[in-house]
Amino acid sequence: ESGCFLVEGRKMVEEALASAFDVETVLVQEGMELPDGLTMPVYELPAHVLAAVCDTKTPQGIAAVVRMKEQSALGKHIVVLDGVQDPGNVGTILRTADAFDCDGVFLVNACADLYNPKTARATMGAIFRREAYSVTVEELFSLLQKSGVPLYGTALRDDTVPLAEANLARAAVAIGSEGRGLSQQVLDECAKTLKIPMNPRC
């Protein structure tokens, strides 16, 4: 509701400071060394007060309040998460999307909160390097249609093709939830579905 989220630990704070995100406030444990060149308000807090604010059991003595970014234009390579509920999974997929240089990640259908502290930690800083947004399914479909980006799903059906045979020069690839896979609503909008061929012994 505030339009802000909390990140914890020196690495995440430094990633936030180096990014295009606006860092509203830095919270630091009394006696801790501060990063150089801070221009935003900095509050020194007793260790027990900072620990109460943070999500981790053993905070690293520094945290930051960061403003969420407004949505930018859609890129050519998009990952869609459809109902992925575990914050660690959402964060890991965002980190993987960053490793593959994807343009953005869109979350639909009650995914884990993008700005949950567990999600943010699992991204290992990728949340500050990749565009990532929670949107409604209708908003996603509208964005893809306006941008001319086809939607592909990771599921098995009659038109499923091996990943290596798909033209992904311009594409959004949807990944379903841990328990049920892709929702029918998203599956119905997929131009094709993709599979990764596996060794029969697997």
Positions of predicted regions on the chain:
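N-terminal positively charged helical leader segments and presequences
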Residues: E1-D55
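Structured adenosyl-cofactor binding patch, chiefly the S-adenosyl-L-methionine
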Residues: A64, A99-F100, C111-L114, K118-I127, ...
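RNA substrate-binding interface of SAM-dependent RNA methyltransferases
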Residues: A18, E70, L74-D159
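Short beta->alpha connector loops at strand-helix junctions that form conserved
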Residues: L45-P46, D82, V108-N109, E131, ...
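Short loop/helix-cap segments at secondary-structure boundaries that form the rim of catalytic
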Residues: E33-M40, Q71-L74, Q184-D188
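Acidic/glycine-rich phosphate/pyrophosphate-binding loops and surrounding catalytic core
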Residues: K57-I62, V66-A73
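Short, polar loop motifs at secondary-structure junctions
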Residues: R10, V28-L34, M68-K69, L156-D158, ...
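Active-site/ligand-binding-proximal alpha/beta "capping" segment
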Residues: Y152-C202
